[in-house]
């Protein structure tokens, strides 16, 4: 993480190590240092960040293993905060928590472990990019204005090169179209007599949110391709979601489904303190996964950036990895793209805060976590949202944050979970009981919620004017089933009224055929909105028609649930086969199939009454 200028200049400020406690180092003679300034500790020049200042003593959290540091070792000040290199070449790259490219380090040292104090450029500054300018000499520009674009890869076709948010001036020279590296100056600006050159990349401090022109309200859904999420608990692009769940509930599978099938332009996946083998699985799986864009099959790595920070890496880097991920997401958002950021898992980040807080002898709060836990979580989640970007041309972008939470023993009253639930707008609660029954995605439909339903109503009404009613009927059936289960366990199913039997049977269809989804089949790994809508409509039509014929028949001609099952078994079986329609067959053919099925349901029940 070296600065653009040489950090080893002779007049560089230097302190000395006074005490070491795990990842926390106390240094003296640090007068003139700033909070969150980047420092290099010891002869290995380990990367660290100042987190407390008292007199001329600084407390530093070190992002690398501190074994071997001794009292009196030098501490070099860089005069800069922890910053990222932002430019073309981020997508399909794998970084660690402080944006060091793992692949480059592996090729450099030929060892699977990262050596301490390794200094390497975050982005490949030798690779040439095909740059097409869109400004001319004499133009007045300010932060966020688009200079031109490069083709990052076949999915990220238009990577906009922007003026950094804190720069302005008049264009005095700009390069013509052609191939340039990240080292080349591509534009010169003059402001108040000072000339500044800009490259294809710029640096931005991770703890500072990138400025926006205005925040907008989200009104377009984040489509995940998972029916239970899209139909019952939808999120908006620019929303905040939490996925709490115990070990083995399928958090990572939902995260991967979002990466593969969500309607985002790019995905930033942060593995924060996860097990090494889980992260290895993601690193091995993602390059082999493909998505179909405009009829072409492309690797999803082309629109994904991985920030890998496993549980055996130093704890301090977990906090950095979360901020690294959100800063990368904001950079792509400023181009006018819709970005999904997965943080897996925020509990491990909170544990890192707890450990460092303990070493700083701060007063612990609930569960040993520091008192500022919820403030830190809030400042992270607040960086999500749909925004109008600064600069011209006018464009809108969004960052959606999906944070996985791993409460110990699946206990949702854990301080991290409760703090997260006070902040996020969508809660997808995973349940161990459902996962053990092999019901995936194991989202508990009784405790999960979304506060975006009203905001998304206009979108769903364009999909189907009746959609919101169908959704609430389905949710009501599932709620009633839960109440009836207690009665069934006491006195058996036969004692229920015919109306209640219909509720139980319909709920079973909703649970097993609609909410359950197999991520490993071609027909069910992704469910487009029209298929979700028609499946829901046909199930609700069956339920409402059943209730109607039972209510309208009377006396000796009273129609029972068993009679319905015997007389029109093909209709009931048809409901269980709806999900086997492959979206590859095309929307028109599938909609026609579901429409015919809907007509069959209505006519079959009409014939029952006759």
UniProtKB/Swiss-Prot annotation:
The keyword ATP-binding applies. It is an enzyme of class 7 (translocase). One of its GO terms (biological process) is ATP metabolic process. It catalyses: ATP + H2O + 4 H(+)(in) = ADP + phosphate + 5 H(+)(out). The keyword ATP-binding applies. ATP binds at residues 245-252. GO terms for cellular component: proton-transporting V-type ATPase, V1 domain. CDD domains: ATP-synt_V_A-type_alpha_C (cd18111), ATP-synt_V_A-type_alpha_N (cd18119), V_A-ATPase_A (cd01134). Transmembrane segments: none annotated. Signal peptide: none annotated. Its EC number is 7.1.2.2. GO terms for molecular function: ATP binding; ATP hydrolysis activity; proton-transporting ATPase activity, rotational mechanism. Keywords: ATP-binding, Hydrogen ion transport, Ion transport, Nucleotide-binding, Translocase, Transport. V-ATPase is a heteromultimeric enzyme composed of a peripheral catalytic V1 complex (main components: subunits A, B, C, D, E, and F) attached to an integral membrane V0 proton pore complex (main component: the proteolipid protein). Belongs to the ATPase alpha/beta chains family. Catalytic subunit of the peripheral V1 complex of vacuolar ATPase. V-ATPase vacuolar ATPase is responsible for acidifying a variety of intracellular compartments in eukaryotic cells. This is V-type proton ATPase catalytic subunit A.
């Amino acid at each position: 993480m070296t600065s653009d200028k040489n950090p080893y200049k002779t007049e560089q400020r230097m302190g000395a190590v006074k005490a070491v406690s795990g990842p926390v180092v106390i240094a003296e003679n640090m007068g003139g240092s700033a909070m969150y300034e980047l420092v290099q500790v010891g002869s290995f020049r380990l990367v660290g960040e100042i987190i407390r200042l008292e007199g001329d003593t600084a407390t530093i959290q070190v992002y690398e293993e501190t074994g071997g540091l001794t009292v009196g070792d030098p501490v070099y000040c860089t005069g800069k905060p922890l910053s990222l290199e932002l430019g073309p070449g981020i997508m399909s790259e794998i970084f660690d928590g402080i944006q060091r490219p793992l692949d480059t380090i592996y090729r450099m040292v030929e060892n699977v472990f990262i050596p301490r104090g390794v200094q390497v450029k975050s982005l490949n500054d030798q690779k040439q990019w095909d740059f097409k300018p869109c400004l001319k000499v004499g133009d007045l520009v300010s932060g966020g204005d688009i200079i031109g674009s490069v083709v990052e890869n076949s999915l990220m076709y238009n990577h906009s090169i922007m003026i950094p948010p804190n720069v302005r001036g008049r264009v005095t020279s700009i390069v013509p179209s052609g191939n340039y590296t990240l080292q080349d100056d591509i534009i010169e600006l003059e402001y108040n007599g000072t000339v500044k050159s800009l490259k294809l990349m710029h640096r931005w401090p991770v703890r500072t949110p990138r400025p926006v022109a205005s925040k907008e309200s989200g009104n377009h859904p984040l489509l995940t391709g998972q029916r239970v999420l899209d139909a019952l608990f939808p999120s908006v692009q620019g929303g905040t979601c939490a996925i709490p769940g115990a070990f083995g509930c399928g958090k990572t599978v939902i995260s991967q489904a979002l990466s593969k099938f969500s309607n985002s332009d790019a995905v930033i996946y942060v593995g924060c303190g996860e097990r090494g083998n889980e992260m290895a699985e993601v690193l091995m799986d993602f390059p082999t996964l493909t998505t179909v864009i405009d009829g072409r099959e492309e690797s999803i790595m082309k629109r994904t950036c991985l920030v890998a920070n496993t549980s055996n890496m130093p704890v301090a880097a977990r906090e950095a990895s979360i901020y690294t991920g959100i800063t990368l997401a904001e950079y792509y958002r400023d181009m006018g793209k819709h970005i999904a950021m997965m943080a897996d898992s925020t509990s491990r980040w909170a544990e890192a805060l707890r450990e460092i807080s303990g070493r700083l002898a701060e007063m612990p709060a609930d569960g040993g976590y520091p008192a500022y836990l919820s403030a830190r979580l809030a400042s992270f989640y607040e960086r999500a949202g749909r925004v109008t970007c600064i600069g011209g041309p006018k464009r809108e972008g969004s960052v959606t944050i999906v944070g996985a939470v791993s409460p110990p023993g699946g206990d949702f009253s854990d301080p991290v979970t409760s703090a997260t639930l006070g902040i996020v707008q969508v809660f997808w609660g995973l349940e161990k009981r459902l996962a053990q029954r092999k019901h995936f995605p194991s989202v508990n439909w009784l405790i999960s919620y979304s506060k975006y339903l009203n905001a998304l109503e206009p979108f769903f009404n364009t999909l189907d004017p009746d959609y919101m009613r169908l959704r609430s009927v389905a949710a009501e059936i599932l709620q009633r089933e839960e109440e009836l289960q207690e009665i069934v366990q006491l006195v058996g199913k036969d004692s229920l009224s015919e109306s209640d039997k219909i509720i139980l049977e319909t709920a079973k269809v909703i649970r097993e055929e609609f909410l359950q989804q197999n991520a490993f089949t071609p027909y069910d790994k992704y469910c487009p909105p029209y298929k979700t809508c028609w499946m829901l409509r046909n199930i609700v039509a069956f339920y409402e028609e059943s209730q109607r014929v039972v209510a309208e028949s009377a006396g000796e001609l009273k129609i029972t649930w068993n009679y319905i099952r015997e007389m029109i078994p093909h209709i009931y079986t048809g409901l269980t086969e709806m999900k086997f329609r492959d979206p590859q067959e095309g929307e028109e053919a599938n909609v026609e199939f579901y429409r015919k099925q809907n007509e069959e349901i209505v006519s079959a029940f009409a014939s029952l009454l006759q």
